[in-house]
Amino acid sequence: MNDEIMRFSSDWFYGGKVESAPQIKYRSVLDYDHPITWIDTSDKEPADTIEEGEDLNFKEQFVGESFGRINKAEAELTLLTLAEYFTKIGKQRVLSESIDVGIISPYRAQVQYLKKLIKKYEFFKPYRRLIS
């Protein structure tokens, strides 16, 4: 795993004890690539969906009996960003090199919502096996 990504999860979840393997420490897909991206959505306008439709605000919603948290606009923004990234790399390269990506969310309900959207959007069909 790229060191910048590993450092985040190592520091946040494991007290800085996890380290990247030296041979992949600086691995990236694109020369101008950023392995991890933070986007402040606190002042964002409502988001459009990948498929034209409703505007979504960046507010968390509680869902289900366990009151899991989801943020639909953040999920849409995440997938729009991923779609742009795949487009920039190129479909042929992503598929031929099996370039896999991971989306990290602290909420189980958000993870389930993201999986649902990935299945819903036709754009992601060829890439589904590469997204975790």
Give, region by region, the residue ranges found by the protein language model:
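ASCE P-loop NTPase helicase motor core
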Residues: M1-Y14, E19
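Conserved helicase/translocase motor-coupling segment
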Residues: G16-K119
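Conserved RecA-like P-loop NTPase helicase motor core
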Residues: G64-S66, K125-S132
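Extended hydrophobic/aromatic segments used for targeting, binding, or gating
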Residues: K115-R129
